[in-house]
Amino acid sequence: MTRHIFNIFPTTIYVSEIFNHKKYKDAFYKVYPKYDYEQVTYEDGEEWVNTTSENTGNPFIHLDDELEELFENIISETKVYIHEVLNYQDIFDLIITKSWISRSRAADENIPWHKHSTSHISFSYYLNTPPNSHVLKFANISNLNGLFDGLNTSDIKDGVRESNELNASTFHINPEEGSLILFPSAMEHCTESHSDDFKGERLAIVGDITLVYKENGDNDYSMGFINPKYRRTYK
């Protein structure tokens, strides 16, 4: 008997190392005070632990002249992801729309599940990862191989014989210092502590990238974003 198996529609996460990481790490620490923020704040008497600086009004690390070369490297790796890995045409300009700090200073400082709904590709560049740092975790939202709710997701008892890429409902990466992780912005993700024995500061620069058609393109695609050159802003 002949059987055929087609594993279709994978989701691709791209991990690379940033060349000259120490140089860029040192450069960031020189400007770190400009982007620092209160890790713990209080609102209506309730304590809030802020694991990112995204909502502090300063998500513009990519505009810092001292870090221009770093972000050029990130864009270069993103082009590899788009053109060489995903095999799309070279028809886009890439725009970093915002960038911010992701930071944990205690084992229980986790970032909850979320996605970056306003961009196409998101990145996380790991400046510092002490031993037992939090992992970056992704969710298989469509989860069609789950067959029915709970078969591969139950926290009490699931039906998975051995977890693999075909039946997994989640996947995590233990980022190394100096690594760059690129992934589709629409992917649900979070950070998760896998050890109580965590000390120090897990620190990353996180950002969003939007693809727009090249300025000199034909503009004959019905989907996607036209280059900002052709937009008009109303206030």
Give the location of each predicted region.
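Non-heme Fe(II)/2-oxoglutarate
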Residues: 1-88, 110
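Short beta-strand segments enriched in hydrophobic/aromatic residues
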Residues: 127, 187, 209-211
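Long, compositionally biased interface segments
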Residues: 213-235
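Catalytic core of non-heme Fe(II) oxygenases with the double-stranded beta-helix
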Residues: 101-180, 201, 205, 215-223
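Short conserved micro-motifs at the rims of enzyme active sites and ligand-binding pockets
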Residues: 27, 194, 216-220
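Short, proline-centered helix/strand-breaking motifs
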Residues: 182-186
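A short coil-to-beta-strand element that immediately follows conserved catalytic motifs
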Residues: 87-99
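Short beta-strand His + acidic residue motifs that chelate non-heme Fe in jelly-roll/DSBH
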Residues: 111-114, 189-197
